[in-house]
Each structure stands twice: as structure tokens, then as C-alpha cells.
A protein has these predicted regions:
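Long, contiguous binding/interaction regions
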Residues: 1-35, 41-101
Length: 101
């Protein structure tokens, strides 16, 4: 299924958009997602970051994969409807950057 509201970006477009995000963002192995790992002190802060990402995602209507553990929270965006990256992934990543710095 192709999502015409958020078409799949070309690799060059995605690379350009990635360069505008916090330096912590990187392409995942297959290039079909972007990911940022945020280091923090302790488990409670990792849970807080995960909840912050989840709350923000719910308000945006674009939900990342979020993993966390003691001292870290990882957020991964992709657009499943296009089997790759869309503008929405980069907008959501930029908004996450604004939240966590």
C-alpha cells in the first residue's frame, strides 16, 4: 500500500534531511529507518524519555519503535505504509530533538 500523503523519499532526499537533524540520528542498517539513541542517567530517566517519545508520537499520529533500558532510550522512525522513510519521519525526529535537546 502506498501512502500518497507521505511518499517514500529517495535516498538522496533522506540523506539531506538526516544532515539537518541532531548528530545522534543515523540510518539503520537497511537504510529504511532512522534511529537516535539518547544516553541518560539511570533507569527512571530512560523510562521518562520513552514515555515522552510515546506521548509526543500519539499527539503527532506517527509512532516510532521505542526501546529503553538502564541508561538509554532509542527511538526509531520509519513509515510502514511506504516501506521506507517519508517526510513525516524527519518531522517527527526533529520534534523529538526539540523535546530532548
Amino acid at each position: 500500500m502506498t501512502d500518497t500523503r507521505h511518499p517514500r523519499l529517495l535516498a538522496s532526499e533522506a540523506a539531506d534531511k538526516l544532515s539537518r537533524l541532531d548528530a545522534g540520528w543515523a540510518f539503520c542498517e537497511d537504510g529504511q529507518a532512522i534511529e537516535r539513541r539518547v544516553e541518560c542517567k539511570g533507569f527512571a530517566k530512560a523510562v521518562y524519555l520513552a514515555n515522552l517519545a510515546a506521548y509526543h508520537a500519539d499527539r503527532q499520529g506517527h509512532h516510532p519503535d521505542v526501546t529503553f533500558g538502564f541508561g538509554y532510550c532509542t527511538v526509531r522512525y520509519t513509515t510502514h505504509d511506504v516501506d521506507g522513510l517519508s517526510e513525516n519521519d524527519f518531522q517527527s525526529a526533529a520534534a523529538f530533538d526539540d523535546l530532548v535537546g
